[in-house]
Amino acid sequence: MDGIKYAVFTDKSIRLLGKNQYTSNVESGSTRTEIKHWVELFFGVKVIAMNSHRLPGKGRRMGPTMGHTMHYRRMIITLQPGYSIPPLRKKRT
């Protein structure tokens, strides 16, 4: 799964889980059809809708100069009723 980076767990994304919608950050160059194909192939689910938005990068100071991080894209994926994505495993610390 090259295009999907990681799942996002914010207040809004946790609320959307009740509507069978899953949120994840993806590579900014990925298209909707690529992400839909990867999700359906990897998780074995049926996607009925996808919403995406681009989030801006953050400013980072490096001494006297100001830099920034790259922007990224977030996808909200809606699955057909009856399908679900299994919970993701936590990283070991």
Curated annotation (Swiss-Prot):
Location(s) in or outside the cell: Plastid, Chloroplast
Subunit organization: Part of the 50S ribosomal subunit.
Keyword Cell cycle (UniProt): no
One GO term (biological process): translation
SUPFAM superfamilies cross-referenced by the UniProt entry: Ribosomal proteins S24e, L23 and L15e
UniProt function note: Binds to 23S rRNA.
GO cellular component term, pick one: ribonucleoprotein complex
Chief place of localization: plastid
Name by which UniProt lists this protein: Large ribosomal subunit protein uL23c
Gene3D superfamilies with a match to the protein in the record: 3.30.70.330
Keywords from the named record: Chloroplast, Plastid, Ribonucleoprotein, Ribosomal protein, RNA-binding, rRNA-binding
Family: Belongs to the universal ribosomal protein uL23 family.
GO MF: mRNA binding; rRNA binding; structural constituent of ribosome
